[in-house]
Amino acid sequence: MDIDPYKEFGATVELLSFLPSDFFPSVRDLLDTAAALYRDALESPEHCSPHHTALRQAILCWGDLMTLATWVGTNLEDPASRDLVVSYVNTNVGLKFRQLLWFHISCLTFGRETVLEYLVSFGVWIRTPPAYRPPNAPILSTLPETTVVRRRGRSPRRRTPSPRRRRSQSPRRRRSQSRESQC
């Protein structure tokens, strides 16, 4: 079977393969990030989103893999064979888990569309010959250039006055903003 764990999310293994292996944080760092940001949702009996479900499954599979690795480390007496198993897990299976965890954490953090746009733009950048591409790779950020941020509770202005047409030279008063969290 040819199963692509990213297909239902609009991505592919190939799309993630454009990112170099050293791009992805360690599994430990990714697990810590997932716990810090999404512990309540991941431990909740409620269904939050397909990304939460995929993240739960990846975390559980990683735990099972570590249990197997501990068993192999304890029961495989030949040090050379043990090192081969550890090396294989770290380079192949570990990378797949790092990619999977990074993808779902990033989709939850930045939004699926932003992550997909990033993967496509990075893929285009990396395949463009160095002489014809910008020196810096695209950066995944929370606010893509097309995003418009508006304050809560205020209607959008019809037009924004240009800085040259300012009516008053006196300092502006600042409105106090509540520090409520916005989800």
Swiss-Prot record:
GO terms for molecular function: DNA binding; identical protein binding; RNA binding; structural molecule activity. Residues 136-183 are annotated as: Disordered. Phosphorylated by host SRPK1, SRPK2, and maybe protein kinase C or GAPDH. Phosphorylation is critical for pregenomic RNA packaging. Protein kinase C phosphorylation is stimulated by HBx protein and may play a role in transport of the viral genome to the nucleus at the late step during the viral replication cycle. This is Capsid protein. GO terms for cellular component: host cell; host cell cytoplasm; T=4 icosahedral viral capsid. Homodimerizes, then multimerizes. Interacts with cytosol exposed regions of viral L glycoprotein present in the reticulum-to-Golgi compartment. Interacts with human FLNB. Phosphorylated form interacts with host importin alpha; this interaction depends on the exposure of the NLS, which itself depends upon genome maturation and/or phosphorylation of the capsid protein. Interacts with host NUP153. One of its GO terms (biological process) is viral penetration into host nucleus.
